[in-house]
């Protein structure tokens, strides 16, 4: 092998390695975003259920459901002043 061939193999290997690292980073960010979206959907679904129950005429709130949603929001790291205690 000539030095030029060896240098080309090293450069191609380095570029492939960088490509794998980059795609791994992108995949990790995508999965984190997907998990965040799932948590948001769960919270919104609980809030929707609470509102539906509240719209019923016989709804008596002891604050337990609202506190459960607030704890869920805070435990998932959402930073929304509406949910601050």
UniProtKB/Swiss-Prot annotation:
Phosphorylated by host CK2. This phosphorylation is necessary for interaction with human BTRC and degradation of CD4. It comes from the Viruses. GO terms for biological process: receptor catabolic process; symbiont-mediated suppression of host innate immune response; symbiont-mediated suppression of host type I interferon-mediated signaling pathway; symbiont-mediated-mediated suppression of host tetherin activity; viral release from host cell. The keyword 4Fe-4S does not apply. It is found in: Host membrane. GO terms for molecular function: CD4 receptor binding; monoatomic cation channel activity. Its main location: host cell. Homopentamer. Interacts with host CD4 and BRTC; these interactions induce proteasomal degradation of CD4. Interacts with host BST2; this interaction leads to the degradation of host BST2. Interacts with host FBXW11. Interacts with host AP1M1; this interaction plays a role in the mistrafficking and subsequent degradation of host BST2. Interacts with host RANBP2; this interaction allows Vpu to down-regulate host BLM sumoylation. Belongs to the HIV-1 VPU protein family. HIV-1 lineages are divided in three main groups, M (for Major), O (for Outlier), and N (for New, or Non-M, Non-O). The vast majority of strains found worldwide belong to the group M. Group O seems to be endemic to and largely confined to Cameroon and neighboring countries in West Central Africa, where these viruses represent a small minority of HIV-1 strains. The group N is represented by a limited number of isolates from Cameroonian persons. The group M is further subdivided in 9 clades or subtypes (A to D, F to H, J and K). This is Protein Vpu. The gene is vpu.
């Amino acid at each position: 092998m000539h030095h030029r061939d060896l240098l080309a193999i090293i450069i191609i290997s380095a570029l492939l390695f960088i490509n794998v690292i980059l795609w791994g980073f992108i995949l990790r960010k995508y999965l984190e975003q997907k998990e965040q979206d799932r948590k948001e959907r769960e919270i919104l679904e609980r809030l929707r259920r609470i509102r539906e129950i509240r719209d019923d005429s016989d709804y008596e709130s002891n604050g337990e459901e609202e506190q459960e949603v607030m704890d869920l929001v805070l435990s998932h790291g959402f930073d929304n002043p509406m949910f601050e205690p």
